[in-house]
């Protein structure tokens, strides 16, 4: 492998979600979710706070177990593909006492440094390999987290609002980077986001979760690269926003304060 041209990864994982349910105590968060996601598709999941979208992602990542239903990678249990799955959070979660390149190669054995440098080059940070995380901006830290996922050659990339804390310009740059790497490598992507404009700008498909159920499943059939501010993109964004903001029989409520998750793990 050369530092100039990263290898094309294996094809993305096809996902099947069948009658998926998740209950916490007496509260049912997900209610018989059914989804089929072809290999290599880019799916964005949107919805109000507390609707169950992050719970869905945690189930796919294996951080929680479903109360009922099935999660499949093709015809096999999704748990069999756990080594091919990586998860990115809103915070990069870099170890401050390790240099950038060591954060990328965390947990790896053997001669991993050339691959780590290659992953950093793919996200535009090869020249920062020997720096400490404290010297990086928020966007650069998320690029390192993305490189840390790429070095494992994932077939399924799960993104839990990884761009939520970034400024507007950096957010757009990261969206474009993720889109470019997805096109190059062909992995399957599930992005959880509150930003509807982000969802329609980069996803093949936008899924709206309403009260633990799939309320909208919209295919975004627009050519890439997509023109931000175009009439067609704005129309799709409006369609999704109108659905999010006007749930039948449910007036808008203040967003609840979400408790801290009880179980987290890095995308290592």
Swiss-Prot record:
Keywords: ATP-binding, Cell inner membrane, Cell membrane, Membrane, Nucleotide-binding, Translocase, Transport. It comes from the Bacteria. It is found in: Cell inner membrane. The keyword Plastid does not apply. The gene is ssuB2. InterPro entries: AAA+_ATPase (IPR003593), ABC_transporter-like_ATP-bd (IPR003439), ABC_transporter-like_CS (IPR017871), ABC_transporter_ATP-bind (IPR050166), P-loop_NTPase (IPR027417). Part of the ABC transporter complex SsuABC involved in aliphatic sulfonates import. Responsible for energy coupling to the transport system. It comes from Pseudomonas fluorescens (strain ATCC BAA-477 / NRRL B-23932 / Pf-5). It catalyses: ATP + H2O + aliphatic sulfonate-[sulfonate-binding protein]Side 1 = ADP + phosphate + aliphatic sulfonateSide 2 + [sulfonate-binding protein]Side 1. The complex is composed of two ATP-binding proteins (SsuB), two transmembrane proteins (SsuC) and a solute-binding protein (SsuA). This is Aliphatic sulfonates import ATP-binding protein SsuB 2. ATP binds at residues 47-54. One of its GO terms (cellular component) is plasma membrane.
């Amino acid at each position: 492998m050369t530092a100039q041209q990263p290898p094309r990864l294996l094809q993305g994982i096809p996902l099947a979600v069948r009658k998926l349910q998740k209950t916490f105590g007496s509260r049912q968060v997900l209610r018989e979710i059914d989804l089929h996601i072809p290999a290599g598709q880019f799916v964005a999941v949107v919805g109000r706070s507390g609707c169950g979208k992050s719970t869905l992602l945690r189930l796919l990542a294996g951080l929680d177990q479903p109360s009922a239903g099935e999660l499949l990678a093709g015809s096999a249990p999704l748990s069999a593909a756990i080594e091919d799955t990586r998860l990115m959070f809103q915070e990069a979660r870099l170890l401050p006492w390790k240099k950038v390149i060591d954060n990328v190669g965390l947990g790896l054995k053997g001669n991993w440094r050339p691959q780590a440098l290659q992953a950093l080059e793919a996200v535009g940070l090869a020249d920062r390999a020997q720096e400490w995380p404290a010297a990086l901006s928020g966007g650069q830290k998320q690029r390192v987290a993305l490189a840390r996922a790429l070095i494992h050659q994932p077939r399924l990339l799960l993104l839990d609002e990884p761009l939520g804390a970034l400024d507007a310009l950096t957010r757009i740059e990261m969206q474009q980077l993720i889109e470019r790497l997805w096109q190059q490598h062909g992995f399957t992507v599930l992005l959880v986001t509150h930003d509807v404009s982000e969802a329609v700008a980069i996803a093949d498909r936008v899924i709206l979760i309403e009260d633990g159920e799939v309320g909208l499943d919209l295919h975004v059939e627009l050519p890439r690269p997509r023109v931000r501010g175009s009439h067609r993109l704005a129309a799709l964004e409006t369609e999704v926003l109108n659905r999010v903001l006007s749930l039948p029989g449910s007036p808008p409520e203040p967003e609840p304060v979400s408790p801290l998750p009880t179980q987290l793990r890095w995308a290592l």
